[in-house]
Amino acid sequence: MTISLVAAGLYFLSRQAAPSEHYKRVVALFHSFAATGLLAFLAWYEYPNGWLAPIWAAFALVLAIADQRLKLQELPWQSHALAAITLVRAVSVNLYFTLSWHGFSVRLLSLAVVAVIFYALSRLIRMPDEWRQLDLHHVYSWAASVIVSLLLWYELQPLSIAVGWAVFGLVLFEYGILRKIAQFRYQAYVALLAAFARIFFANLTAGEPGEFWGPRMYTILPLALILYFVYAQLPQKEENVARDRRLHFDTLVAYLGTATIVALFYFQFPIEWVVVSWAALVFALLGAALALDKPLFLQQGMLLTLMVFSRGMAHNLFGASYFGESDWKGNYLAVSAASAMLLASLAFAFRLRGRFQLGLNGSRLTRLVHAAMRRPEQLVFFVPVLLVTFMLALKMKTGLITVSWGIEAVLVFMLAFAVKETSFRRTGLGLLLVCVGKIAALDFWGLQIRDKYITLIVVGIALTFVSFLYTRYGDTIRQYL
């Protein structure tokens, strides 16, 4: 009581100085700061526990509200000082406070109050206009978001932290969109990025091997949905999100969503079938690019196609060391299924050809990427053809490799005839020429009699069939080729 009365007296004395009297004003400032310091010290003395931080935060809020009416230059600085010591107290003491109050966590209640007050201070505390134009008042909202994120870290179970951060990021993003406040959206992007990083340390390895619906699935799938939802919520032409797009936050969020699913599939499916799941995702991405008219999903689909090729070659085909033997023991059905899925994606890739207007300027790499995106069917075709070609070379017996390549060449040529694509036709012819060259250089001299005759017969039939197609449909072929 005594300290409270002294503080009240000091506040009263500080109000008696005229603003024009410089020395009296300095003394008045001293009185005001002394009063605030006494009350802050009193709170520390009376409540040296988990409730001190919210008391200091509430005191800072009261000073900010009083300053809205009184317009005293010292009150905002006192609020800043109280907020600073509140933040230090919250991070150094309250985060590690484990006691309960009426069955509720003191840490949860106290830090929630501090965070709410900090969000309020970002709006109420008085600052010079030039400071607000620089968004310096959002130091408080950033501090509040950090407190909430740390609170979620300590209060939630390890597997729930990523989901908690993602939901928190979604709330911040929606508020930033609703109120057109960029800083809240930036905080949302940081929270979503942190949630994405978190799954690599806890969620992806959760659950039992082979378990389809388990902790891994139901904690990571919501994150991917939230990331895609945030991407879809970004308006295309509104000025207040122009900077978000200029900084490519929309691209970042969309790529994080796809990367989340890619990582989930890597840990969710048996190691041999990862390549198939990724190929299915390519199909979905190209379909989304066509349905939503978004070149971003086309980029992701083509990038993932390259990942399918790398995974198929490095693990499924040439990953014999994983199985402890020199011969290939991988599942040929997995590579075949992945290749079939990519070939099915041609239905979307052809319709995406030349659909998006891409710049012709830039570096050589940029021009190469844009050229590939203008003709996505080329990459989507050649990747499965190469995978199947290498798979046949590794899987088939020595005497049947050329035979299998000849059959593949005929199928490729028939596909080229069906879709009317020159590069596909040339690929089929190239495979046939490879078969002829292999027969002349290796098979004729090294195969057994039976395998030699089978190879010659099958390749001869393939050449005859292709020649028949050229003769029978020569005019049609010349029209579109």
Predicted regions and their residues:
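Alpha-helical transmembrane segments of multi-pass membrane proteins
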Residues: 1-481
